[in-house]
Amino acid sequence: MKAYLALISAAVIGLAACSQEPAAPAAEATPAGEAPASEAPAAEAAPADAAEAPAAGNCAATVESNDNMQFNTKDIQVSKACKEFTITLKHTGTQPKASMGHNLVIAKAEDMDGVFKDGVGAADTDYVKPDDARVVAHTKLIGGGEESSLTLDPAKLADGDYKFACTFPGHGALMNGKVTLVD
């Protein structure tokens, strides 16, 4: 019954969010330490592929989320050469986390459905079941204008297909992507 009520609540929140004025299209994910393309000097060219958050030889990436239940990337590339890799999640919207909160949770692709189901009842722990062994890493739940980071060991991604998603109820169907281990 709790899951049913949670799903109804998520649907109501999703419908309310969808009725909002659409935001501008999301910019590409920016590696940490670099200015977004819109802030870069005119002489610098923006990367051509906005579909992935590249590791680009460094050990950090930034993923943006918004009030339209979107991440600005569908692929986070993690370099095998890194001892640690940090992903910063930025919520570029304005709505509070109670109505349009986002997190970024990494798990094996085959485990993600279970992570979602167990997360629905875990509002007090940012919609992530406490001590869930299936979760490689996750950020805290954030609202508009906030950010949160996670740090992981890339070696944990060596044995399988991994995904990232927002586990706020109703968001995972739209807010998800692949985590790719690269050379």
UniProtKB/Swiss-Prot annotation:
PROSITE patterns with a match to the protein in the record: COPPER_BLUE (PS00196), PROKAR_LIPOPROTEIN (PS51257)
Domain Plastocyanin-like: 57-183
Cofactor, how bound (note): Binds 1 copper ion per subunit.
Entry GO terms, CC: cell outer membrane
Keywords: Cell outer membrane, Copper, Electron transport, Lipoprotein, Membrane, Metal-binding, Palmitate, Signal, Transport
Lipid bilayer topology: Lipid-anchor
Protein name, UniProt field: Outer membrane protein H.8
